[in-house]
């Protein structure tokens, strides 16, 4: 029997390329000093999640496409970055929506704690977006390098910041599995430019944070104010066995729910914005919002 050819697109993704001196990576956001090489770009084939059968799910694969609209308007999303009132509205109304989405997708979990959100907007073409990686201004742009939001030590850091060390220890003792779950949604237009890509590692049985992640230690990091403390970023290393998945023309009425950290590495989902070689020349700039929640199963 012939093997079915999955609908896909071709594109470019950035992955860890090490440091200039062979030491642990660092980035000083105050002056731009770093020993981290620019991400190495790889040509990839990216399969459309819409066409996968069976569909990946949060519980089985660590990521899932859902069709759940929001009551928040485009203007209210955009206002969140302009005023304290707009920020508070997102944390009140949209955080509650994201909790309900996670509850529905997971079939019910013990505890969901929304902790932060990030608005992103793509400005400029592929080259300008890639070159700005690591600059302060790039923190609100799509990240064209494969990464995980956190690993175990840095996830414990944000947990302790959020609930305190004593409560954190209580939760960790009670739950065998916990994760940071992101709800990622386009704003205004479909996410055609710089779509989000998942690096499925089901074919890598030994995949874990130690073997497939490089560290970039942060100094004077301006992102602390909106994502919490994190001593280093987790940049993903290349492996020929990754399967790359995305959603074609993800609509604002849809969202992607995925584990950006999981205490069981099998479910931790490396992800990245990627350059789609087949993106229409007139595709609109990409705006998106992601809400990060600590989830205890």
Swiss-Prot record:
Keywords: Oxidoreductase. It comes from the Eukaryota. It is an enzyme of class 1 (oxidoreductase). Pathway: Secondary metabolite biosynthesis. Its EC number is 1.-.-.-. The keyword Protein transport does not apply. Oxidoreductase; part of the gene cluster that mediates the biosynthesis of squalestatin S1 (SQS1, also known as zaragozic acid A), a heavily oxidized fungal polyketide that offers potent cholesterol lowering activity by targeting squalene synthase (SS). SQS1 is composed of a 2,8-dioxobicyclic[3.2.1]octane-3,4,5-tricarboxyclic acid core that is connected to two lipophilic polyketide arms. Belongs to the asaB hydroxylase/desaturase family. This is Oxidoreductase R1. The gene is R1.
């Amino acid at each position: 029997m012939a093997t079915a050819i999955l609908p896909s697109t071709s594109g470019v993704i950035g992955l860890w390329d090490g440091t200039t001196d062979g030491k642990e990576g660092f980035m000083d956001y105050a002056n731009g000093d770093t020993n981290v090489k620019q991400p190495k770009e790889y040509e990839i084939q990216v399969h459309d999640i819409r066409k996968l059968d069976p569909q990946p799910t949060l519980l089985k694969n660590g990521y899932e496409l859902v069709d759940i609209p929001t009551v928040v308007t485009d203007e209210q999303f955009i206002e969140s970055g302009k005023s304290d009132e707009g920020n508070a509205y997102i944390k009140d109304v949209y955080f509650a929506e994201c909790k309900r989405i996670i509850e529905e997708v997971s079939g019910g979990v013990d505890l969901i704690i929304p902790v932060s959100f990030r608005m992103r907007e793509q400005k400029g073409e592929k080259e300008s977006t890639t070159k700005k990686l690591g600059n302060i201004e790039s923190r609100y742009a799509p990240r064209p390098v494969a990464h995980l939001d956190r690993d175990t030590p840095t996830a414990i850091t944000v947990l302790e910041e959020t609930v305190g060390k004593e409560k954190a220890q209580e939760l960790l003792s009670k739950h065998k599995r916990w994760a940071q779950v992101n709800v990622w949604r386009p704003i205004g237009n479909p996410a055609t430019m710089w779509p989000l890509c998942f690096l499925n590692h089901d074919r890598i049985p030994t995949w874990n944070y130690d073997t497939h992640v490089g560290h970039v230690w942060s100094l004077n990091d301006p992102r602390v104010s909106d994502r919490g403390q994190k001593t280093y970023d987790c940049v993903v290393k290349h492996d020929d066995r990754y399967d790359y998945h995305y959603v074609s023309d993800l609509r604002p009425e849809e969202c992607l729910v995925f584990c950006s950290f999981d205490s069981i590495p099998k479910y931790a989902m490396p992800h990245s914005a990627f350059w789609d070689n087949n993106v229409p020349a007139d595709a609109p700039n990409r705006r998106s919002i992601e809400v990060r929640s600590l989830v205890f199963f």
